[in-house]
């Protein structure tokens, strides 16, 4: 059996190529500890961020997730109610509550001056997390549409041996 996940590669390409957001030496806060986060932590570690912190409603799940990547960088975990006072450069939302009408009022004690917020969820309207982020001083925000497109291109490359161009697809879908 051969299996691939394109969550990490799709996210990285969207962050770095489409959005121009660097993550090397960044403090990254991940909200949620589900399957999508499992798929992206490894890829984020490869970019050598300063730190990655996973915060989840169920604290034990956050710790279980970072244990999978021990020795891959500075990884810490907590509940959503105990996020460290670190100047977060990038906050990535993977909470299932983001699919609902509102986003939970999570206290993020410190943001970097140029903090960015990224929602793994995508929509033709601002997601609940993007609206929440806009109201809390994030300088840049994006939903996960670019990640979805980049994942599709990576999957196509796995099956067909060549990676299709994605910039035009993303531009068309954003208009």
Predicted regions and their residues:
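Glycine/small-residue-rich loop that forms an oxyanion/phosphate-binding "nest" at active or ligand-binding sites
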Residues: 1-26
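Rossmann-fold NAD(P)-binding glycine/threonine-rich loop
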Residues: 8, 102, 107, 115-166, ...
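N-terminal Rossmann-fold NAD(P) dinucleotide-binding loop
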Residues: 37-38, 126
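Conserved S-adenosyl-L-methionine
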Residues: 45-51, 135-140
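Rossmann-like NAD(P)-binding element
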Residues: 58, 82-104, 118
């Amino acid at each position: 059996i051969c299996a691939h996940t394109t969550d990490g590669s799709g996210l990285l390409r969207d962050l770095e190529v489409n959005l121009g957001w660097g993550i090397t030496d960044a403090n990254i806060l991940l909200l949620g500890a589900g399957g999508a986060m499992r798929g992206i932590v490894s890829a984020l570690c490869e970019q050598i961020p300063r730190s990655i912190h996973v915060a989840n409603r169920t604290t034990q799940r956050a710790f279980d997730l970072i244990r999978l990547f021990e020795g891959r960088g500075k990884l810490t975990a907590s509940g959503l109610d105990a996020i460290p006072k670190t100047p977060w450069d990038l906050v990535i939302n993977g909470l299932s509550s983001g699919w609902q009408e509102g986003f939970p009022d999570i206290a993020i004690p410190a943001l970097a001056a140029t903090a960015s917020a990224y929602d793994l969820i995508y929509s033709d309207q601002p997601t609940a997390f993007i609206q929440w982020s806009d109201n809390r001083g994030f300088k840049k925000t994006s939903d996960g549409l670019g990640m979805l497109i980049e994942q599709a291109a990576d999957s196509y490359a796995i099956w067909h041996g060549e990676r299709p161009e994605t910039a035009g697809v993303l531009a068309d879908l954003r208009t």
